[in-house]
């Protein structure tokens, strides 16, 4: 894909994921398409296959059978497997995984060196503003709070100019105060970024605040895919998910 078409492709592409991966107690077997912008949440109890799906999309795990198509690019099929380093994915893990010997500014600059397109969809100045990083740029990761580290990790994921951002429970390691501090930044990211995102969580409060679409998983199967606004009124598909929602509603 040529850099001159990056902005246009973000609005026109579809993202289709079809996977079959054996797990210890079930076979992950999913087939779904996500919107070409906004946040799609993978929601379900621990061990339902959410992180496995992200790893397969990122190329960190190869599905026994599968098809992953992002826009006009096939990342996996019977005949094709694009390695992880060639997939235009920004990945945010549960822990920030920043480079400890670099400052915040240097971590962000390093991401720019790894970007997938010569034309920028988002600039350094934009992510610094979105995530409130201006006062942190000269600091080392070990001097940051958990929430601050995740803000840097989110900014870094965007600066590689990905086609897709994957977030694997990015708030799960934070205390409640840190979660509440970072949620407004995630909301701003949602409002400002045109890059589609997949957000993994078993916390309905986070999903209700951040996501547009929810894919409900249980034991490796999709129980439901709908908008977040419509989902709570029709929860009959996942008992564990209903318990999670009842806790917050």
Q: Across the structure, where does each feature detected by a protein language model lie?
A:
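Conserved ABC ATPase "signature" region
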Residues: 73, 77, 119-136, 187-188
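ABC ATPase NBD coupling module
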Residues: 75-90, 114
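Conserved ABC ATPase signature
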Residues: 140-144, 148-150
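A short, proline-enriched helix->beta-strand linker immediately N-terminal to the Walker B motif
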Residues: 159-163
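Catalytic Walker B motif of ABC-type/P-loop ATPase nucleotide-binding domains
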Residues: 165-169
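Conserved H-loop
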Residues: 194-200
């Amino acid at each position: 894909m040529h850099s001159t078409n990056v902005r246009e492709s973000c609005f026109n592409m579809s993202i289709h994921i079809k996977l079959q991966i054996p797990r210890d107690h079930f076979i992950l077997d999913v087939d779904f398409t996500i919107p070409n912008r906004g946040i799609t949440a993978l929601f379900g109890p621990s061990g339902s296959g959410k992180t496995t799906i992200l790893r397969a999309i990122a190329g960190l795990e190869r599905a026994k059978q599968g098809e992953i198509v992002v826009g006009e690019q096939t990342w996996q099929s019977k005949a094709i497997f694009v390695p992880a380093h060639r997939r235009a994915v920004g990945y945010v893990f549960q822990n920030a995984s920043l480079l400890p010997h670099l400052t915040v500014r240097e971590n962000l600059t390093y991401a720019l060196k790894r970007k997938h397109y010569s034309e920028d969809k988002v600039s350094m100045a934009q992510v610094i503003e979105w995530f409130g990083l201006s006062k942190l740029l000269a600091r080392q990761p070990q001097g940051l709070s958990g929430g601050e580290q995740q803000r840097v990790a989110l900014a870094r994921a965007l600066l590689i100019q990905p086609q897709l951002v994957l977030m694997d429970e990015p708030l799960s390691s934070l205390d409640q105060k840190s979660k509440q501090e970072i949620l407004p930044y995630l909301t701003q990211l949602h409002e400002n970024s045109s890059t589609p995102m997949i957000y993994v969580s078993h916390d309905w409060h986070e999903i209700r605040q951040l996501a547009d679409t929810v894919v409900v998983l249980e034991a490796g199967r999709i129980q439901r895919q709908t908008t977040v606004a419509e989902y709570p009124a029709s929860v009959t598909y996942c008992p564990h998910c209903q318990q999670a929602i009842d806790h917050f509603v």
